[in-house]
Amino acid sequence: MLPRAARPPCLRVPGHFAHRGPAVPRSTPRISTRHSIQFRVFSTSKGLLNKNATSEPKTPISGSPLAPQSADQKTKNAQNAAGTPKRDLLSETMVGKQEQRKADWAIMKEMAKYLWPKDDWGTKLRVGTALSLLVGAKILNVNVPFYFKSIVDSMNVDFAAIGGTAYTVAGSMIIAYGVTRIGATLFQELRNAVFASVAQKAIRRVARNVFEHLLRLDLNFHLSRQTGGLTRAIDRGTKGISFLLTSMVFHVVPTALEISLVCGILTYQYGAQFAAITAATMVAYSAFTITTTAWRTKFRKQANAADNRGATVAVDSLINYEAVKYFNNEKFEVARYDKALKAYEDASIKVTTSLAFLNSGQNMIFSSALAGMMYLAANGVASGSLTVGDLVMVNQLVFQLSVPLNFLGSVYRELRQSLLDMETLFNLQKVNVNITEKPNAKPLQLHRGGEIKFENVTFGYHPDRPILKNASFTIPAGQKFAIVGPSGCGKSTILRLLFRYYDVQEGRILVDGQDVRDVTLESLRKAIGVVPQDTPLFNDSIAHNIRYGRIDATDEEVRKAAQRAHIHELIEKLPEGYKTAVGERGMMISGGEKQRLAISRLILKDPELLFFDEATSALDTYTEQALLQNINSVLKDKARTSVFVAHRLRTICDSDQILVLKEGRVAETGSHRELLELDGIYAELWNAQEMSFAQDPESEGNAELEEGAGQEVLPDSRQK
């Protein structure tokens, strides 16, 4: 333990706990003040990099959308800041028939662009070839009944009398029949092969556009998202694209073509009666299918909504697996999931039973028409006006219509389902991006070294609870700046506003004299590096998560960044080293290890403006001090503007300036010594934390060790 005289100057201020007094028994209650002080427990970092580790889950930050305010300007700013309330895109809201029809046509027109894209002659050639093959297949199919008729009529002779065989009598017709059927099948399969790339390319483009749009949406959308339902809706929508494109090209128009050909043949060969029955059958069949399918749509929507809810519950429970276990709530989560499954079960039963009704009605209409036409043909055979071959041909032609008709029925059903699925997908693309660039936005120019200025800034996530209230302060370029205050006073919100996750409702934010709303988002965010409270990690390797700070970084640069973040040696001890996977959201490593990986990212990105939001809260004292030493050396060597948000005041007492927030307003500013001499809120927070160390002998020991380490950590330029 170092003598008190050897401690850093910020820990040796006379009159402010220079004498701590005797240790207070452990049972003595902790001090509590009106400023809602958060006490942090110093603990040893554990996790994947420590064999005796347990993961440390963190609670995600939640937000709520900002409702419109009374004044017009405030309304506009509020909407830009946090978005106006919208209906849940994943809840299949019932709409009127006219609105649904408009939405369906809009989707059809949008998808037509992928079928016949401008300046893409390759796609146009494939679509044209596929259509040609389709027409060829339909023509061959229509010829099959003619060959069948010829075969039957040729065979309707006395073979013994003419001394012939099946081959000599009908051989050529049999061969033509087989070749025609083979040709029709071959054309259909070639059509599918040629069109496959068109459908897959469209799926890829739509899915990429939706994903790109989701990444452009503001933070408010993603804080209120339902991950499981969202991914399920995207999956269903992309699958629906292929079916919709195939239906548009290969089912709807071709079926109409085939029906027209059959009606024309029946009229020409056998008279208007046969064609009239065929046409009436088509009208009745189509009308019944469309009407019944429209009635069934609501059951499909209910099933989709229940499916989304079930996926959301399942993903949410599995992601928060540890929380479920901590509170023994497995039965509760199973009950939640089962409730969603029950809703899906009920809706699916309605879908299935209504489908049975639809199929029965379709078969009844078709079978009635077939029986009527066979009766007319049989009368013709009996009267001698038709041959047995004609009877067979009529039967074949009508049965040949059954295939496209059945397709038409199922296609319409699935087409409606695909349109419903794609409606959600395309609605995601219609979500407004609230945080946008001005048309004349220019790249951020840091010609003053990165001075940050907040001028009369007012902002709140909810109109009834503003976070920042007319806040004004300046963060000088190249200095270490700290922001402290009770929880909920707006410390982390400052970063969100600077990063333009939200826009201010009043006032403005300047970086080197440039309003952040006047510069490009890419240049602004490229200049800012962040170590957040809850470090986001991908379910990938350690190397990938570090390299995410700069995607084009080499392996050597990744290692150097890890070394400066004091995590390289721990990584090297792992069997797979930098290839070790960190698990979903980094759950396989501890909070301290997450923070060091986040700092590695920041070092690799090397931005001009650095934000540390409780960046070392999960580290043990030794690691924290060694890491702060490296961070301070970087700040000193490169003169970076840095902002530290902290509850543990010992980690920021060497800052050039400290800003104290209270209830969204700037309460105090100054150096550590100046604020203690002011004897205001900061002094009260400091004294309360010092008393907490005095009351806990273990914390006292850690504090002494921290102070001793701090003697080496703080650069001379920071000691005041």
UniProtKB/Swiss-Prot annotation:
It is found in: Mitochondrion inner membrane. It comes from the Eukaryota. SMART domains: AAA (SM00382). The keyword Cell inner membrane does not apply. Its EC number is 7.-.-.-. Residues 452-688 form the ABC transporter domain. Residues 697-709 have a biased composition (Acidic residues). One of its GO terms (molecular function) is ATP binding. It is a multi-pass membrane protein. Residues 149-171, 269, 376-390 are mitochondrial intermembrane. Residues 48-57, 70-82 have a biased composition (Polar residues). GO terms for biological process: intracellular iron ion homeostasis. The keyword Translocase applies. Keywords: ATP-binding, Membrane, Mitochondrion, Mitochondrion inner membrane, Nucleotide-binding, Transit peptide, Translocase, Transmembrane, Transmembrane helix, Transport. Residues 1-49 form a transit peptide. Its main location: mitochondrion. Belongs to the ABC transporter superfamily. ABCB family. Heavy Metal importer (TC 3.A.1.210) subfamily. This is Iron-sulfur clusters transporter atm1, mitochondrial. It comes from Aspergillus oryzae (strain ATCC 42149 / RIB 40) (Yellow koji mold).
